[in-house]
């Protein structure tokens, strides 16, 4: 997979460990052919080009997927008398109480509904793809994960979150009146601005969060997607398959993506050592692997090295980590898309050339940002007691 001293070691079954050297050069067209700015510019040009792929086509495609999501998710529980799938422009059609639906099922439905509405309206407004992506991933988190939101206010949260993200991403952000228009005057200016303030206060103004959007577009370009329409479809299905495991069921999302995208292979990026008995993060990875296997019996699994010492946690400065360069991981993904299918059904462990302790990485981080270390050594039981509410 890489030249210049790559070491492969069999660790049992179909698992291979691929260790990348520091100065390894990667074979083939692994680096994205387009620089970052060119990729973003390409996406911006696509959204502004109505002739190549009109906003109406995007809206119609999103609406069809949204209807299927309604059927998939609502079929999991009994629909109360008179309850109808919500339309793309509102949630008032969804009737019945939360007790009838079940709170977890309601979260599933609400998250998918909000994503569907955002997808269509964001495309209609011809915003930058990054804006629509950020808004589609942040609005459900704000409305469903961080606080309780009434059913009739879900669309208001989506509109206000879109306003925030436009101010953050766009050079010229739309006015509040534009959002009143796209919501069919369902909310007033005062309601939208009040919800905007509420969201910002809830987030404590922490808006700078990393998203996979740029990496998705770079990988899409490096996978020889010639059409901007293909890039948009890939971005759309990626949004539908976000790893909000507690909000939307994995198997439902993968099934929808598989049926609409016609995928022939599935590549899953997970962690080494993921199991039901691991830490919470690794347990989530293990649950994701189990859900993937339900729809794709033989996926290609790329397992990134997480920690070498099992049973330890991030609080333990002696925990060992073998980080791998993200470009090497991206190269492995791109190469797996270009092979003849022989890699399907196998698992590859990806690890870097060096092994560090958590203490080493902390020292490196503070040295890089030119700040004095802000940690103290405490006994591990005390550290666990302090961190237990957040774990």
From Swiss-Prot:
BP terms from Gene Ontology: cell division; G1/S transition of mitotic cell cycle
Gene3D superfamilies referenced in this protein's UniProt entry, alphabetically: Cyclin-like, NAD(P)-binding Rossmann-like Domain
Domain of life: Eukaryota
Swiss-Prot/TrEMBL keywords: Cell cycle, Cell division, Cyclin
Cytoplasm is among the record's keywords: no
GO cellular component: cyclin-dependent protein kinase holoenzyme complex; cytoplasm; nucleus
Annotated InterPro entries: ComplexI_NDUFA9_subunit, Cyclin-like_sf, Cyclin_N, NAD(P)-bd_dom_sf
A Pfam short name: UMP1
Disulphide-bridged cysteine pairs: none
Gene Ontology MF terms: cyclin-dependent protein serine/threonine kinase regulator activity
Keyword Cell division: yes
Family as reported in the entry's similarity comment: Belongs to the cyclin family. Cyclin AB subfamily.
Protein name: Cyclin-B1-2
Species this protein is from: Oryza sativa subsp. japonica
